Amino acid sequence: MIDVGDKAVTERTARAEGWIRLAPEVYQRVTQGQLPKGDGFLLAQVAGIQGAKRTADLLPLCHPLPIEGVKIDCQPLADSQTIRVEARVRTTGKTGVEMEALAAVSAALLCLYDLTKMFDATAEIGGIGLLEKTGGKSGHWQRPAIAPDVAPTGALAGVFATVITVSDRVAADQAEDRSGPLIQNWLTDQAATIATATCVADEPALIQAAIQAAIAQGSALILLTGGTGLGPRDRTPEAIADLGAIPVPGIGEALRQAGRSETVMTWLSRSGGWMLEGSFVIALPGSSRAVSSGLAMLQPLLPHSLAILKGADHGTVKG
């Protein structure tokens, strides 16, 4: 059994589906509530909930989790004489609930088969699969086959952002910048507009000039990567603070918490967040892996944070 002790505790969700195809007369019995054993949809929902809760008992290497929510939907599809079952499972933990969602769908479908087999044992179960999951290091995943033709509006639509890589070696063309492009791709996925992406050496004056230029260009979000460690030239946090920026302590705490699943060295990082002239300035570590985990942590926080920085009332902002 995999040790998940070092993984970060995050909110995790999963959504799965499956279907059962019935003979026409059996389909009619189910949809009209004419089964001798009771309401087929209600019993399938109960079975699905039980399936999610007992997943760790069925699968030997699956971690037992404190399930916080299970929702089972049964959708009759008259054209194909099928019942589509969808399960949504939610928890806050160190590992995902994909198997719980799949187990819930399977249990609900098996319950429907059990309720109807006396009329027709040839009912067919199929299409069981994961639709979507969120949480953890990998963030949001959606099964490609069901991805919408038009991408939904990203969480940072309309936000102007700047990416600043802080590295002596990258600035001198002695190393490849991996974290900067990673942040840019993430911002693009969130529908943000990238005003500038630049690289500067580990010089406080250069860091400050890049930040001030970003603010002058109207960037509401300024993401820096690098210069947050214990090295003699790691001075990104000091450069930001010396501009008169107001610290947001929880950001650094959350970034280190998110990175602890990657390495214990995350506790040596001095990454953090600041408010400066109406912009949100966030200093991420230089490691691309730490950047990935940090961005996953920031994703649900940024829309609310940026709205509040613009003067929105707390009660009118979701999240």
Swiss-Prot record:
Pfam families: MoaC, MoCF_biosynth
Biological pathway: Cofactor biosynthesis; molybdopterin biosynthesis
GO term, biological process aspect, one: Mo-molybdopterin cofactor biosynthetic process
Catalytic activity from the UniProt record: (8S)-3',8-cyclo-7,8-dihydroguanosine 5'-triphosphate = cyclic pyranopterin phosphate + diphosphate
Annotated region (Molybdenum cofactor biosynthesis protein B), positions in chain: 146-319
Record carries keyword S-adenosyl-L-methionine: no
GO molecular function annotations of the record: cyclic pyranopterin monophosphate synthase activity
Active-site residues (renumbered): D114
Binding site for substrate: L61, C62, H63, M99, E100
The family this protein is said to belong to: In the N-terminal section; belongs to the MoaC family. In the C-terminal section; belongs to the MoaB/Mog family.
Name of the featured protein: Molybdenum cofactor biosynthesis bifunctional protein
Species of the source: Synechococcus elongatus (strain ATCC 33912 / PCC 7942 / FACHB-805)
Name of the gene encoding the protein in the UniProt record: moaCB
